[in-house]
Amino acid sequence: MILVLIQPDLGTTLTYAPILIAGLFLGGINLRQSLILITVGAVLVGGVWTSGKILKPYQKARLTSFINPGNDPHGSGYQVLQSEIAVGSGGVWGKGLGKGTQTQGYFLPIPYTDFIFAAFSEEHGFVGAFFVLLLYFLILMRLIQNAQTAADLPGSLIIMGIVAVLTFQIAVNVGMVIGLMPVTGIPLPLMSYGGSSVLFTFLALGVAMNVRMRRFVN
């Protein structure tokens, strides 16, 4: 994780956290081990934050600007403010496909990547955004069901690790778009433009399907 962070790639680094937490929790970690892990994690996070060699100034600005983006409306808070305007202006039914003023007017920078949910919400409104979240919920529930019926414990752990990553990515991206989470560069699975993200998601779903298939292998 530290090596990936040094690259620097904050979004990918954060993605490893839910895999670790889900694996330890499902693997039966006890209270004492949990406290040790939390302490070590807090020390590492504090060290990374205070060190000027790992987190870059722009990364720190991204992590803190969501608290009050209005403090820097033309800098680190610009994307969050424009995203909130896009989501709010969509209303219930949206402005229509290709008619979003924030998106088409280029007020929302690069809307097809990390802020694709804001662009979608502006054009399709609350109803469209709710439908997308419902589809994600159904996918995650199906994966959890496959984990419960897996042939062995390793298979269950693999699928639950995938569930943890996808849940984390969805929660952080949507939270980032509506101003509840910091801008970290984490994409929205199956929607954000980006080859590596799409490839990872399809590979993960393929692995989950393989685990499910092996229930029927004697």
Where do the PLM segments sit?
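Alpha-helical transmembrane segments of multi-pass membrane proteins
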Residues: V4, V45-W49, I162-V172
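Structural signal for the C-terminal ends of transmembrane alpha-helices
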Residues: I21-N30, L138-Q148, A208-M213
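Hydrophobic, glycine- and aromatic-enriched re-entrant/interface helices and adjoining loop segments
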Residues: I36-F130, A151-G155
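A juxtamembrane structural motif centered on a specific transmembrane helix
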Residues: Q169-N218
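Transmembrane alpha-helix interface/packing and boundary motifs in multi-pass membrane proteins
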Residues: M1-Q7, S89-W93, S121, V172, ...
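Hydrophobic transmembrane alpha-helices and their immediate junctions
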Residues: F126-I170
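Interfacial segments of multi-pass membrane proteins
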Residues: L14-Q33, T101-G128, I186-A204
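Hydrophobic alpha-helical segments of polytopic membrane proteins
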Residues: M1-S51
